[in-house]
Amino acid sequence: ACSSSAGYSFRAVLGPCTGAVVVDCIEGLTGTLSDGTSVAGVFKQYFPLQGVTDFVGSPSEGVPSGGPPSLWTLAGAPHGFGNDYEVTVEVVGSKKNGDALTPTRSFFASVTPVSLFQTACDVRYNGHCMDTYREEVGLNGKTTIGFAGVAADQDAGIRCVNWGENGKCALKHAFPAGVKFALKVRLSTSPSGWLHGRMQDPVASIDRVNNVTTINIAANPTKVPIISGVGQWAVLPTAIQESFTAKCANVRCGTRQPQEAQGGYLTMSVADRNIIFGPSAFSTEAFEQIKLWTGFLKDTASAMPSQWSVRTLGDSEMQRAPSCIKSGVGVTGIVATNASAYSEGPPTFDPVTSSLNYKVAALHFEKDGVTPFKGQYNLILRSDIANCLYGVSDSTKEASVSVTGEDGVAKAATTAFTYNNGWFSFSAKGFTHSAPIIKVKLTSPQNDVKRLSQVKKGTITNKAKLIVLSGLKYKSTSRWFVQVSTPNICRVTGTGVKNLKAGSCKLVVYVTPKVSKTVPKPKTVSARISLKVS
């Protein structure tokens, strides 16, 4: 934790629950085999045994204690190099103006197959141990094991996950086939917003009882293609050269030179410098760079590491989220994808098509250059958020999931839709890339339309009439808003709807009761209305 007189920020890595630690801890790790057999994980040790930034939390302020990641043994679910798995669960937050509970907190969790490897590294002399693991055959014909590179917990875990005492390294390995992993965590505070996962077919429950939030997430690991390329300036395609020239003139562009580098370095020709681009997976730049490098990389991924992780989206990623999602309390949804690049934030809502849209991107082939890479997408949406977006009820049984390529042509995909315990779940699998858009739509039977009304073109249907037509209970303390799906016929203006031209004006009215002690999480209700404009 970092502190000052004005407050502090903290990043707490949680350990296992014990008799003394009953909250802000990992309750358990479970593996489920393909035949349905459940294998309970057993806590083995912290790794390292003690971290350099461990700290004792503050129960009165809801700040958990922070320690190292933990190793768990799944004896009945071994991977290729043993049965140890590293579990990392992080809660990140801050104290502002004397309050550590109100500021939004982020949540991260991951499971990684590992084996402990004893290296010859001595931090007293090396400073940092080297962590790129490789096997080489020497001139004498014998195999030697070496490490190179800077020790860092980065690059999607391809290098050592982390380091322990006396030069021990936790090497990452592939997940075993056919094993689903479930992680159960207890928290003193509830995460909020939207979760993003690198996993397949997640099933989640988030319950708060007696001031303890229990998160249980079960999912299969997924393989995410890594896209990387390098080349001398002269051999790079013209489009890539032009991109570097435009973006890196008088700009650092990711080399070891400091950001504030001046003089000859920045005026040096782009062609004479080492330049690195490493855009975020959810950035517009990532989509642009994938398109630029596709031909040079022969449309082939450089690696296919398997992952199992989930995180809350940051504030910057949530800026464009639909109001129904941003105003929701607690975790409002989960999206999971195996694409190299994906849309920033939650899926965007298109009022014209009444669909939640999400764009992804990847190269067409796996590392072997032959096997087509098949996309996977999961969307889990809390029922009250779905109600707010679509104006549907929990009993809705009609949904569509479609995948459309950049050319507007539908792509073949296996899709599914279920509803269980307050959550709608959608999935699309088996589609190809490069940058398709996945659209999810919930619809209600026609008898869900509450009321039809005749209105005149050029008039405004005010709030009072819309509330009456909706048939919803409304108090002056309630929040309300209206969403139009036919903007060419009518549009929202002020607190009403302006009828622009003849046709059918379709809209949804939403009402959310005020938060109270008796109703701490009020449910948003909605009703669909059709105005016949003449």
Spans of model-derived segments:
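Long, leucine/valine-rich, helix-dominated scaffolding and oligomerization segments
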Residues: 1-333
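Proteolytic processing hotspots in large secreted/extracellular or virion-associated proteins
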Residues: 338-400
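Exposed aromatic-hydrophobic patches
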Residues: 376-390, 423-430, 469, 493-498
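Short proline/glycine-enriched turn/loop motifs at strand-loop junctions of beta-rich domains
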Residues: 393-398, 406-409, 473-479
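Solvent-exposed serine/threonine-rich low-complexity stretches and specific carbohydrate-binding patches
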Residues: 409-422
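C-terminal beta-strand-rich structural cap/linker in extracellular carbohydrate-active enzymes
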Residues: 424-446
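Extracytoplasmic soluble-region selector
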Residues: 447-534
